[in-house]
Amino acid sequence: MKVSKVYTTIDAHVAGEPLRIITGGVPEIKGETQLERRAYCMEHLDHLREILMYEPRGHHGMYGCIITPPASAHADFGVLFMHNEGWSTMCGHGIIAVITVGIETGMFEVTGEKQKFIIDSPAGEVIAYATYRGSEVESVSFENVPSFVYKKDVPIKIDDYEFQVDIAFGGAFYAVVDSKEFGLKVDFNDLPAIQTWGGKIKHYIESKMEVKHPLEEGLKGIYGVIFSDEPKGKDATLRNVTIFADGQVDRSPCGTGTSARIATLFEKGILQKGEIFIHECITEGKFEGEVLSVTAVHTYEAVVPKITGNAFITGFHQFVVDPRDDLNRGFLLG
């Protein structure tokens, strides 16, 4: 056996959505900011993403993360997230998983019963709080970047369907649409059709307009499409599934997507500051969200959302790359 690369990871999940934290085998990542570091990874380290996200080591729905030194003087650390299509700008379930793994494995030092973390992400600064007993994390909450409605009631015409979507930012840009527009429910049976519509809507919007953050050039494009539905759980407010990247299905309620959804509900007067919003996902998992404060991003009214969830470690792994293997960089099916 020949080995050219060895990577170590800690894997976890949040409401079924995986996160693979790469703990060994990562070379130096250059850049002063997390956006610059993300750009560096896109240009120089995409092979690492393919090796660890793609089959046979990963799968179409795999999500990953690299923990970096902080980019700002007051942050505790930085994060860079990856998926089946590339490198994302922020990931809410990823924040929940990183904090949980960091505390439960002793990677992060904690004192008392609640710990605050300041995290640099490509989308901006994120503040997270962990509640734990001993080495077991009970929940993680994070204050996300300012989230806002970019455009509302955007008309869409695809095939014989005409409908409207809201476009909102919650760390990445999302199009929000009701699943009933297509006669679909957010469940496993309708998931293939929802995936197809997610791709169509994303491509339609990006062919008609440029979606770009008013302050950060590197934050642009539709990351995902949120399909909203009536909840199944008695305590849930709404049910959703997010289709993002290259048709990837978010098993969790989607942290940045929930932030974008909170922004749309607040803008419409449906959700008030301090009111609890329970977002249910296709696996029946839930995130708790609320509006902490109201602010502005350039000319847009924005909210600072707080999202709460929990994560569980699923494994500790060591992956190798054999240079003789024709599939050593991986492949994707589905």
UniProtKB/Swiss-Prot annotation:
It catalyses: trans-3-hydroxy-L-proline = 1-pyrroline-2-carboxylate + H2O. Its EC number is 4.2.1.77. Coiled coil: none annotated. The keyword Manganese does not apply. Catalyzes the dehydration of trans-3-hydroxy-L-proline (t3LHyp) to Delta(1)-pyrroline-2-carboxylate (Pyr2C). Is likely involved in a degradation pathway that converts t3LHyp to L-proline. Can also catalyze the epimerization of trans-4-hydroxy-L-proline (t4LHyp) to cis-4-hydroxy-D-proline (c4DHyp) in vitro. Displays no proline racemase activity. The keyword Lyase applies. Belongs to the proline racemase family. PANTHER family: TRANS-3-HYDROXY-L-PROLINE DEHYDRATASE. Substrate binds at residues 92-93, 250, 255-256. GO terms for molecular function: 4-hydroxyproline epimerase activity; trans-L-3-hydroxyproline dehydratase activity. Keywords: Lyase. The active site is at residue 91. This is Trans-3-hydroxy-L-proline dehydratase. It is an enzyme of class 4 (lyase).
